[in-house]
Amino acid sequence: MKKTKIVCTIGPKTESEEMLAKMLDAGMNVMRLNFSHGDYAEHGQRIQNLRNVMSKTGKTAAILLDTKGPEIRTMKLEGGNDVSLKAGQTFTFTTDKSVIGNSEMVAVTYEGFTTDLSVGNTVLVDDGLIGMEVTAIEGNKVICKVLNNGDLGENKGVNLPGVSIALPALAEKDKQDLIFGCEQGVDFVAASFIRKRSDVIEIREHLKAHGGENIHIISKIENQEGLNNFDEILEASDGIMVARGDLGVEIPVEEVIFAQKMMIEKCIRARKVVITATQMLDSMIKNPRPTRAEAGDVANAILDGTDAVMLSGESAKGKYPLEAVSIMATICERTDRVMNSRLEFNNDNRKLRITEAVCRGAVETAEKLDAPLIVVATQGGKSARAVRKYFPDATILALTTNEKTAHQLVLSKGVVPQLVKEITSTDDFYRLGKELALQSGLAHKGDVVVMVSGALVPSGTTNTASVHVL
């Protein structure tokens, strides 16, 4: 069974009910909506379509809204045509938005461009395809020397590696998009270009103000500043997305894999969910099979311990969206089979909190008894994530009375959430857990299961792990 979860970006190729049903069958767990593209009517329809499919099939999936975030882009060019730049030529950026650009100058969307940059800084355009060095700053103009040949287009992303920029965490568009997300009841917000703790807090306050206090925030780490402040960002967030696209432009490409491993490890220790994203099966936008390197990349992220792997263009606009999900699911399943439980966390000598100690004990017991299933009663999802931290061989069946929690646990590795009407007592939990263990096919008559619950089942400290034979 596949334990690693798959996040699929949904676009024109995959938005119909028919396609969404096939994507769920193929292994999709979370629908990602990229708010850098599309309007509210399109995104609203996609959400409705997924909910219709879920109610018809009884399958559970989560919805993730990915914000555009505070980014810098190039503006208009003459005739809307790309311009060719040559290595060695001079090129100027201006903050005067009325300028229509050409092969010598273009306007950028960010007012503070001239104040944040210094002579000697690097400017990268279009995912780093064109590099420039700042040679002078005059008034509202930044004058650069072009470092390599390339074609510059309008509305292309501009990165300033190593420069701390004063853009707000939430652009006006993001604020409106988050309100839309609250109205639609999305499960997660993936917040782009998070640079520091206060960015996350600002987003959380905005969500709270519009009835979205239960939406989980996944912070996307996309630049050096985000990496430098990673610990404080992790603490303020519900999870992390390792956004390797922009990150690989902002930091040297050979550093990205080490940043990925560091972030995944810290997320596991903190019991926070982590998604590894960008270019995972990139060649499948055009080809029916991935490269061997891509298949290895997906497996490597899973071995690192990621909760989920993500498809972007592969599922939103590619030629082979279904094949991409199927192949990714196959790689997940194969790699999940070789993962061992991790009861020995290095340097984990600190005293464990009650919940964590009980959950760790449950995993240890399940390993020793070869139990195929650990059943957890969880209100907000903490206990289920505490069990997941130790990578049990057993599947985790998480019973919750909270619909939001059920959807959010869809993203956690190895967790199968199950919404139940009520759990009145510990005995009721044992009865219900055993019934659902058999019904779901996750365990069979005669199997040993480990059950984890609290004294006050509705909420409170998880303090009991017990062993049952079905």
From Swiss-Prot:
Q: What is its EC number?
A: 2.7.1.40
**Effect of altering residue 413 to Q?**
Partial activation of enzyme, loss of cooperativity in fructose 1,6-bisphosphate binding
Q: In which pathway does it act?
A: Carbohydrate degradation; glycolysis; pyruvate from D-glyceraldehyde 3-phosphate: step 5/5
Residues annotated for Mg(2+) binding in this entry: 222, 246
- Residues annotated as binding K(+) are 34, 36, 66-67
> Where substrate is bound, by residue?
32, 220, 245-246, 278
Which CDD domains does this one have? Pyruvate_Kinase (cd00288)
For the keyword Nuclease, the answer is no
**Reactions the enzyme catalyzes:** pyruvate + ATP = phosphoenolpyruvate + ADP + H(+)
Cross-referenced InterPro entries? Pyr_Knase, Pyrv/PenolPyrv_kinase-like_dom, Pyrv_kinase-like_dom_sf, Pyrv_Knase-like_insert_dom_sf, Pyrv_Knase_AS, Pyrv_Knase_brl, Pyrv_Knase_C, Pyrv_Knase_C_sf
Q: Does the keyword Aminoacyl-tRNA synthetase apply?
A: no
Query: How is this protein's activity controlled?
Result: Belongs to type I PK; fructose 1,6-bisphosphate-activated.
The UniProt entry's sequence similarity note says: Belongs to the pyruvate kinase family.
According to UniProt, the name of this protein is Pyruvate kinase I
